[in-house]
């Protein structure tokens, strides 16, 4: 009733009820309720006599007049610094709050002690002790009442846990009996113990049955959660799985929200009406070094930002002990102080005491000082933040699940290090504090009510005991009952997925037979490969094309009419090309994820689709095609997270190569993406030259991912080009295993002259073939051609053998695969690709002879292909000179032959080859 009176309302009048503070400043004192009611009655009368449109018009005119008269109006994107949900609208709390509080404190203790014990002498592996301490209620309300496990009839929720709060999840699993004390003592010691350890953060790669979603580095969690929620809807709209009763929760830090990935895609959640998504931002006002916003207020900033992007915003600022004070705040003085106090001051308050708060907060106004005149300093000190109030948090979560047609963000005000004691709570240095002193331990124990004696703590301050009351304790039974009712323990990851039928390789025979006299780019060959797979009924609906607004560039527009572009709202307009065969078609059941100019979101979709086999038990195969320059260079961190999450699928780096994308210039022309990709162990990198190679790679990739008895966690990165080239038919007796492992002998040179070898990949194969012809015709040299489909695979194989030999010097680790392959021929070796020399140089150690590497080192630039290739000396003529030079070093020909060839071909003059006979016509 207090809230209703504060709003000037009559409880029986449905036009004047307590309301959710959603975009208006509703927590204001009403100095004349009678006049307020007259205005309300006038509005009611207008609505009865006229229409909502008329009422809207008049309200807007009133706002216009108020602005003209310089009436200070609140911004519609933010509300007062108070709880969004009025006390009178809070639901009944359904659990046993005291019971839950007891084991919440035990979990908080064990989480901190786990990190503390990890700093024992000889270990000292770090950890975050304060984040979970302050966020514990945010998680425990969820675990006890909202988060649904894998066995829930609706399928279970997906929870993105804040990375730095991982100790709390381990501590809870210990209370549940899923982890042992020994497991906790293995925190951050994954390989140094025989029995293994547990990773620092949520890393599925490190705990395959536990963690589902990697949320570090910071910023990835928010973005991936949005696209996970969207992919859930995608599966539902396409009829693959009913996800209507599944919810995505993302727990984030307020400092983390400064990452571009944290905020940069929130509009997508609103555009897609993702009411299956809730962000919970732990607003402890601190980042790693200091306040998130010292002079202003991060909660208010985030409220405006999210509300402006179309989200529902719920603020949980103050705990229940503030309710009475706010009720007495008849003239709004307390709310005014709350509004005007900066985050820096709020942090300082919690680093002092109640007397300080009385003087420097309530003492700012005589009216607020009077509000607390009968409270002790201790009572003032104990006034809690909203994120520590179980009932306030429960009300926010319940409201979030009831919100329809838009996502929700909950902004929960907390104290970093809450409960750890005065030396930790709200301190700037708390991020770097990894252990507690003996006095800190005793104070922490007392505040949490842990039944551990001084003697136990003093025995070895480095190893204070964990606490567990035993499996038969009522608290443990209650905790387990709550999880059983909600569908099982969390976090949990499973890999029980429906099998898919991998079509036979013969399905791709049309791609493998070549293009005849027609020249086609390997990009088009890739599109044709997947188009053939789309015709297979057992596989077609499991393919997920992902495109960042370049479908027409890649020749994928032919998929628009048949597969359609996914849009949950359908297509409520007539497309400008509606009368064309390849018209732009959107539909709720569309298969293509067209992400716009948005590589970050595209990779997030790739992750959601590529991990669906574990998240949803549905094997999906994403094929994300993009400008290769904007893949690993732009979104490498996300692809790293994809590997951590054990995603499966295809990354297709189109318009690849430093010289192949004509004219685009320095920022577009990719000469190093395979080098970057080589650093990611979850990715196998290929640079195929021919269509039949692509067909083999794609088929083998799908089979490795989902073939019978396979299930490899592998991502294929395949570079493909936009330059049309001849596509030969698959040779008889093709060395298929060589193709997959990274190199095979494509052709042998003819004649009786000196022998040499050219190793080529990608579009570089065409220059190698031309060079071989010149060498044979003009210099009598027999040039063998090797197709190097994967320099990276070859280097990894060699490195693995080196490591095996290092660890067991007496054992035979075997010969590197590339060495064995190259021994089929003799003579020097010259490698060429449209990438930097770093790529072919990865195998130098295992090449059994003189080895020269040509590559496109340095920045790209705008020009023709021939000019660029002459500039970088990777064209056919440069290869010829490199081969001749190698033969001269071996004493087989005179060096003057190479010198004359270099002068003849003008290798230092790009102007001599400025015309491109294969340039596309505009």
UniProtKB/Swiss-Prot annotation:
GO MF annotation: an example: pyruvate dehydrogenase (acetyl-transferring) activity
Domain of life of the native organism: Bacteria
Cross-referenced InterPro entries: PDC_E1_N, PDH/Transketolase, PDH_E1, PDH_E1_M, THDP-binding, Transketo_C/PFOR_II, Transketolase-like_C_2, Transketolase_N
Record keywords, A-Z: Magnesium, Oxidoreductase, Pyruvate, Thiamine pyrophosphate
Knockout mutant characteristics: Cells lacking this gene display no PDH activity.
Enzyme class: oxidoreductase
Pfam families: PDH_E1_M (PF17831), Transketolase_C_1 (PF22613), Transketolase_N (PF00456)
Cofactor: Mg(2+); thiamine diphosphate
Catalytic activity line of the entry: N(6)-[(R)-lipoyl]-L-lysyl-[protein] + pyruvate + H(+) = N(6)-[(R)-S(8)-acetyldihydrolipoyl]-L-lysyl-[protein] + CO2
EC code: 1.2.4.1
PANTHER family: PYRUVATE DEHYDROGENASE E1 COMPONENT
Subunit structure: Homodimer. Part of an unusual ODH/PDH supercomplex, consisting of AceE (E1), AceF (E2), and Lpd (E3) together with OdhA (E1+E2).
Biological role: Is a specific component of the pyruvate dehydrogenase (PDH) complex, that catalyzes the overall conversion of pyruvate to acetyl-CoA and CO(2). AceE has reductase activity with pyruvate but does not react with 2-oxoglutarate.
NCBIfam families reported for this sequence: aceE
UniProt name for this protein: Pyruvate dehydrogenase E1 component
Species this chain originates from: Corynebacterium glutamicum (strain ATCC 13032 / DSM 20300 / JCM 1318 / BCRC 11384 / CCUG 27702 / LMG 3730 / NBRC 12168 / NCIMB 10025 / NRRL B-2784 / 534)
